[in-house]
Amino acid sequence: MQNIKLEKREQDILINISRIISEEVQNLKDVLTTVVGIKLSSDLSHCNVYVTFSKNSKKNLERLNQASGYIKKQLSSILKWRKIPSLHFKIDDTFEKSLKIEQILEEIKKEK
């Protein structure tokens, strides 16, 4: 039962952070930012937010981390939870890793 509650909270955070970033974070207006996933700690105190950017990933990640206080404040006004977790933005590199694995598999196929 606890996992269902945790997943529900992760979904609530994901939906609202995506909206806040796309509509309200001024220094990312010219960049396509996609929130790929959320991982909320079991004690609800920390939240890793996995994102991808259309360009300048490291620079935009810094901008997003600078805006994390503002985003947390906006979340608190929307969600009305007793405690809003600290937000930690991270670049999601799953796509790049999957491409690398595919390339390795193709090389193995060619060798046979």
Swiss-Prot record:
- The main location class comes to cytoplasm
Q: Look up keyword Cytoplasm and say if it applies.
A: yes
Q: Which Gene Ontology cellular component annotation is one that this UniProt entry carries?
A: cytosol
Keywords, A to Z? Cytoplasm, Ribosome biogenesis
Compartment(s):
Cytoplasm
Under InterPro entries, the record lists: KH_dom-like_a/b, RbfA, RbfA_dom_sf, Ribosome-bd_factorA_CS
Q: Which NCBIfam families match?
A: rbfA (TIGR00082)
The family classification in the record reads: Belongs to the RbfA family.
Describe the function of this protein: One of several proteins that assist in the late maturation steps of the functional core of the 30S ribosomal subunit. Associates with free 30S ribosomal subunits (but not with 30S subunits that are part of 70S ribosomes or polysomes). Required for efficient processing of 16S rRNA. May interact with the 5'-terminal helix region of 16S rRNA.
Q: What is this protein called?
A: Ribosome-binding factor A
Which organism encodes this protein?
Mycoplasmopsis pulmonis (strain UAB CTIP)
